[in-house]
Design a protein with these regions (language model features):
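C-terminal accessory region of radical SAM enzymes
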Residues: 301-331, 356-404
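N-terminal pre-triad scaffold of radical SAM enzymes
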Residues: 90-116, 134, 141-150, 345, ...
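Radical SAM enzyme [4Fe-4S]-AdoMet core and its adjacent flexible, acidic
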Residues: 2, 218, 222-237, 241-340, ...
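N-terminal [4Fe-4S]-dependent radical SAM core
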Residues: 15-48, 63-101
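Short Fe-S-cluster ligation motifs
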Residues: 135-155, 421-451
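Generic structural signal for well-ordered beta-strand positions
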Residues: 47, 352-353
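Conserved glycine-rich "GG(E/T)P / GGGxP" loop and the immediately following alpha-helix
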Residues: 101, 105, 118-284
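Local cysteine-cluster metal-coordination motifs and their immediate loop/turn environment
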Residues: 107-117, 356, 391-410, 426
Length: 451
């Protein structure tokens, strides 16, 4: 048996092995040419065994301490699924970790060909909302130990001064109260300058920047021009270099459909041949068609089934250039986006639970100034009570601890303004292929332990 990854998530399993054990419910096993893969989604351990080893383990009534530590076996008396489901329910009430998204502006200076937001209102984060955000945090002082802030829009940099003002307060608040702080931004990257890059990274402590680049210069400029029609690629490319120079982690988000898929390898070549190689991350995303997207988009987008091989081919190519690693999925926070501490705050203080519903008033759950006293709409109460066990698609799936049931909004409701209408996470279609390639690479490098 080859061990490629040990228990990294459930260290309590390094205890005494019980007298009676069973094969863990959370073992996701599948064959590859080299044998049988077993990935335990609760512990994160990953092993490869021969077919005979696998058959023998399935029949085993006892196990070694190492197999127990890996999580491949569980106490025979334990209902692993029900125990996880109860933990999931408890996780929804966890407010020790606040995950706040701020919409600094609903405006945008781009005219992207696939934009979902339609006519963008001229709204920026109000001073009154900023005051209410401060009060919200002050009231919760001492109840949480970590704060993650996401800056979003529209285009959040249109509200640049709001980011500066609110960041200054939040950083002082966290430092004075011993709260761990982390901050990220999703931006088109155009309104940055060298001075702004330095201020955002060093003063505002925004460490992660998700910036969409949809191809090489000609293709990107066709898809993501300014409202005036002017191209944006050169400016964004320079700004990304400045961010990296100041120590930021930049993620190239590449939105892919049938119009630009063939151009993406050329973009990857450009990144690999630049000083950005090894310093940035790549995130491949499928273009979605939904509600407010342009009418002619339908024939250009990939279905989930169509996109999976396209994505895997690009992952392989990016890997060959040293731009991407084959990835094993991470565990989602217990309770997922249903957690009480996970909210999105709009420009006027309105609260959403899902980024994909921004701008639709029917999905507003309340307001930041009355969050503890305002009556909740019935749909929201039902939403908060949802668990993966309520979904036919989730029930019986062994990947639940990794995705926390995926998107509960898509599981319960059929309409929203934008984003995927699928419940499952976007990494799922190529999940096993990535594991297979990960194992093959580790074998070639002789990076594994034997048992």
């Amino acid at each position: 048996m080859k061990i490629f990854r040990n228990n990294i998530w459930e260290n309590h399993l390094q205890s005494v092995v019980p007298n009676e054990v069973k094969w863990s419910y959370w073992n996701d096993c599948f064959p590859i040419p080299d044998g049988e893969v077993c990935f335990n989604v609760m512990t994160g351990s990953l092993v490869l065994m021969s077919n005979s080893e696998y058959e023998n383990l399935l029949k085993a009534k006892e196990c070694t301490s190492k197999l127990w530590e890996l999580g491949l076996f569980a106490d025979v008396k334990k209902d692993e699924y029900r125990e996880w489901l109860n933990t999931y329910r408890e996780g929804k009430n966890d407010e020790s970790f606040l995950d706040l998204t701020f919409l600094t502006s609903r405006q945008c200076q781009f005219k992207c060909t696939y934009c979902f937001e339609g006519l963008k209102p001229k709204k920026d984060l109000t001073d009154e909302t900023i005051s209410h955000i401060k009060s919200f945090l002050e009231k919760r002082k001492g109840s949480f130990q970590k704060l993650q802030v996401y800056w979003f829009g529209g285009e959040p940099l249109i509200g640049y001064n709001k980011i500066i003002t609110l960041s200054d307060y939040i950083i002082r608040f966290c430092d004075n109260n011993g709260i761990e702080y982390d901050s990220s931004i999703t931006t088109n990257g155009y309104a940055l300058t060298r001075e702004r890059c330095e201020e955002l990274v060093k003063s505002c402590r925004i460490s992660r920047y998700v910036i969409t680049v949809d191809g090489t210069e000609e293709v990107h400029n066709q898809r993501r021009p300014l409202l005036s029609g002017k191209g944006t690629f050169k400016t964004i490319w320079q700004n990304i270099h400045w961010l990296v120079d100041f120590g930021a982690h930049v993620v190239f988000r590449i939105t892919i459909d049938k119009e630009n898929a063939d151009n993406i390898p050329l973009l990857l070549d450009k990144i690999a041949q630049s000083s950005l190689a090894g310093k940035v991350s790549i995130a491949l995303a499928r273009t979605f068609e939904i509600l407010n997207t342009p009418e002619d988009l339908g024939s250009k987008v990939y279905s989930e089934r169509e996109f999976a091989p396209v994505e895997m081919k690009l992952i392989d190519y990016a890997h060959s250039l040293g731009l991407m690693n084959y990835r094993l999925p991470h565990k989602a926070p217990l309770g997922g986006c249903l957690r009480k501490g996970d909210i999105t705050i709009g420009t006027d203080g309105e609260i959403y639970k899902c980024l994909d519903t921004i701008g639709e008033m029917k999905w507003v759950t309340g307001s930041i100034d009355k969050i503890d006293s305002e009556p909740q709409p019935q749909w929201y109460k039902d939403y908060l009570n949802w668990t993966p066990d309520d979904s036919n698609q989730c029930r019986g799936c062994k990947l639940q601890p990794l995705c926390s049931g995926g998107c509960p909004h898509n599981a319960m409701f059929s309409d929203k303004m934008h984003g995927s209408v699928l419940q499952c996470p976007d990494w799922k279609p190529n999940y096993r292929l990535q594991i297979e390639r990960y194992i093959k690479e580790k074998i070639e490098k002789n990076e594994f332990d034997l048992l």
